[in-house]
Amino acid sequence: MLAVLSNHVYRHLFLAQLIALVGTGLATVALGLLAYDLAGGNAGAVLGTALAIKMAAYIGVAPIVGAFADRLPRRALLVTTDLVRAAVALCLPFVDQVWQIYILIFVLQSASAAFTPTFQATIPEVLPDERDYTRALSLSRLAYDMESLTSPMLAAVLLTVINFHWLFAGTAVGFVCSALLVVSVALPVVRRASDARTGIYEKTTRGIRIYLKTPRLRGLLALTFASAAASSMVIVNTVVIVRDQLERSQSDVAIALAAFGGGSMLAALLLPRLLDQLSDRRVMIFAAAVLAVGLSAMTIVTLTFADAPGYWLALLAGWAVLGIAYSMSVTPTGRLLKRSARSDDRPTLFAAQFALSHACWLVTYPLAGWLGAQSGQAAAFGAMAAIAAAGAIGAAIIWPSADIDALAQPTNAAF
């Protein structure tokens, strides 16, 4: 897998992604502490609002930026958004009002909504070979999982010697380093198929129209709901299950999340070889089915053995299985997007996936949390299992088994 790093351009881009991820992880910890510093017991409401603003920025900004990304130099766009994020990070330590957090978070996440899909659409241009690109996707998944495990630990170590405000400085350094790595390489020039002028509506909706006209991508949307259901259950309710239901320590929350992350990392390591042998469709639909079965099993276990001594081990095993299946269901996404559009359409298509996937999370995050709080964790598990099962079945129906690599070309009346 690491052989793909021999590509000079990709190596720099991967390091830029990795450093920016660590910086983002530090900012996540610091933002929670800043919210508590300003709002005290209402910090949860502040963070919840910040999360909603983040999702709104991702869903609203990504398609707009994606529509114009092919008309802008990609390197300049990536560097500019990195520098904007660095500037916002440097402003956050000076915040003394909650509303200021909301404004800065919107600017920060809008820049991320511009950076991430453009970055993702650039990788297949740098690595046109399918096998190399698959390995790059697995490395990217590993980077995300490693960040989720290491950034909180790094923040904990730093907080023993510095004030949390300095974590924002670390975030800014990460974004600046990312910008320097991007500017140090020449990115492929993507030529537009046509210079014909089109309206704003046509440009901003093109990615979603291509997405919805492509059967494999409609199937991908169903799979995205399945993966969002599983990840929402883990992200939202792990702390409640471990701390409230099991009455275990804060470190056990980290252990449970590490079980999910470890499973995801294991799958990312194995996926390149697996995808050499099996189709994306078979792997991803099977993974979604495993998510549904795993969540269903946890529903039964929670209903019958929630108070048993072995529930903790069952939770760890369940989270590991969900982590494996989650990684298998989301990692090949880039391969589907790559083969579903021309080079000049890829930024807008990646932006469409970015927005639609976060729209799925915008549904499943609050649903998992509300059901867990109001009806109990078994109800939350059951609802997420139903969503995952519907996603797996829907994908199997919508995504043709004889998948043809044809590019969908939407008309103005198609959407």
Give the location of each predicted region:
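Alpha-helical transmembrane-bundle signature of multi-pass membrane transport and export proteins
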Residues: 1-415
